[in-house]
Regions:
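Leucine-biased recognition of intrinsically disordered, low-complexity hydrophobic segments
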Residues: 21-24, 34, 43
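Class I SAM-binding transferase module
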Residues: 58-142, 147-442, 447-486
């Protein structure tokens, strides 16, 4: 009987970390009133980042994991959903707050962004370096958070700044305005930007367009970007605000353009750790299953395949936040999407269409120069602060004399966005004297369950050619995998 209980104790110890994580998620969700979200959505909050960063490096042998074209948990989840414009729908507001806005009401979250030097330096340079275009202008900061961008706009000479914030962080933003002596210039408005009414007459503002009397804003500033640019789908709200409040011929967007990039990377320790933790979780299940049968007489094997799917989706088919060293990038980056913030539509913000030519990639990695294998594909973005390039405003809008670029690529070091890495189940080896080619495409779509989250479908194949005569030595079968960006 002792051996049975020893087996039980061993099995329970090995699954304790999984139970602890679930309990921790539950506590966090209750603390911040995250009612009605599922375990996958719970992992999108900082607990998941803490779990990823605190995992110990595994030294066990690399585990081969069977790949599938579409992971069952994410099958048929690509949707065309839009972020609700609310229009008084209190139920929609409550759901979106629980699933998205709530964490932005916490100062710890704001501090994480404010401590991002690359982020701060880029916005500060873009605003203060172009103070001439802010002088005497009307500015709107969408998603002001702590209000720092609104403060800079006022300091740069803006006549009026409207700082829009949906959460109770608006109360802190008002304190920040007063502490920095700009409370007479900056008006903090708490609410969804889709629903707010600007105090235009009260502030003495006039519009030259009688058909659109609310178009009084000269400059929009916003830090709306999420992981791999589009995650969180805040761009929808910014586009609606732009179309409603901006002067179309002379208005400016900060940032003005954004670009998404991908590149092959080497990050084998993390890739192998994901594989090994998946294998360990399945070993935990086996112990649990046997113990439950021996001690309690209940057969649980019927659930093994479902548990396997859950674990594989989490460990293998979810992208990972990484702060990659520049040396891990094995080839030139490939641009897969560009957004002009003056002309992009909500349809543009929904993702990356595999039918677009830009979504296709081709990389060549020289085995003589690089150490293999290729671990996966990484994605990141840049945000440009520059003059308008669209036909409507390129001649009539003010010119930015000091353009700025914010990059979240590995060459920049730490940003809170990091890079999203989509790991292959097995690394692609590099061989001396040979060039390894990867060709494929990437599709990014919103999930049906939550329009603020995205899935990425990556199709790829590899081949190797001799560096001497160019002869093809190997060609793999095409592979396809769907990843969630948590």
């Amino acid at each position: 009987m002792n051996s049975v209980y020893n087996t039980y104790e061993k099995g329970m110890n090995r699954i304790n970390q999984h139970i602890a994580l679930i309990l921790l998620q539950s506590i966090f969700c209750r603390q911040y009133n995250l009612i009605g979200i599922n375990s996958t959505q719970a992992l999108t909050i900082p607990i998941k980042q803490y779990h990823q960063k605190s995992r110990k490096m595994s030294t066990s042998k690399d585990i081969e994991v069977e790949t599938s074209a579409t992971s069952p948990a994410f099958a048929n989840t690509s949707g065309d959903g839009e972020i609700p414009s609310f229009n008084g729908d209190e139920k929609a507001k409550a759901s979106d707050f629980a699933n998205y806005f709530c964490s932005y009401a916490q100062l710890y979250h704001q501090k994480q962004m404010l401590a991002d030097h690359n982020r701060m330096a880029a916005y500060h340079s873009a605003i203060m370096g172009n103070a001439d275009v802010f002088k005497d202008k009307v500015v709107m900061d969408v998603g002001t958070g702590s209000g720092i961008l609104a403060v800079w706009a006022a300091q740069a000479g803006a006549r009026k700044v409207y700082a829009i914030e949906y959460t109770d962080m608006a109360k802190h933003a008002r304190q920040v305005m007063k502490a920095n002596g700009v409370e007479d210039i900056v008006t903090v408005i708490q609410g969804a930007v889709e629903e707010i009414v600007l105090p235009i007459e009260e502030d003495g503002l006039e519009c030259d367009d009688p058909e659109h009397p609310e178009r009084v804003v000269d400059i929009f500033i916003s830090e709306w970007m999420g992981y791999f640019l589009l995650r969180e789908s805040m761009l929808d709200s910014l586009i609606r605000a732009r179309d409603k409040f901006m002067k179309p011929a002379t208005g400016l967007m900060f940032p003005s353009h954004t670009t998404m990039y991908v590149a092959p990377v080497q990050d084998e320790e993390e890739r192998r750790m994901n594989c090994n933790e998946y294998a360990a979780s399945m070993s935990d299940w086996q112990d649990f299953q046997e113990t439950t049968k021996q001690v309690y007489g209940v057969e649980m094997e019927i659930l093994k395949s479902d548990f396997d799917r859950e674990q594989k989706d989490y460990y293998m088919w979810s992208s990972r936040w990484r702060e990659l060293p520049a040396a891990s990038v094995l080839s030139e980056r490939k641009m897969i999407k560009v957004l002009d913030m003056m002309t992009c539509t909500i349809e543009d913000s929904k993702g990356v269409d595999m039918g677009d030519e830009a979504s296709k990639f081709e990389f060549a990695v020289d085995g003589d120069r690089e150490q293999g294998p290729i671990s996966g594909i990484a994605g990141w973005f840049t945000a440009d602060f520059k003059s308008r390039t669209d036909e409507v405003g390129k001649d009539s809008a003010p010119k930015l004399l000091d353009p700025t670029i914010l990059s979240t690529g590995p060459e920049m070091g730490y940003t809170h966005w990091g890079q999203q890495v989509f790991y292959f189940a097995s690394g692609i080896p590099l061989m001396q004297g040979q060039t390894t080619n990867i060709t494929g495409s990437l599709e990014m779509t919103r999930t049906k369950e939550n329009a603020r989250l995205y899935n990425c479908r990556i199709k790829y194949a590899s081949s190797r050619n001799s560096n001497n005569d160019g002869k093809q030595l190997m060609k793999s079968a095409p592979k396809e995998q769907v990843y969630m960006i948590p």
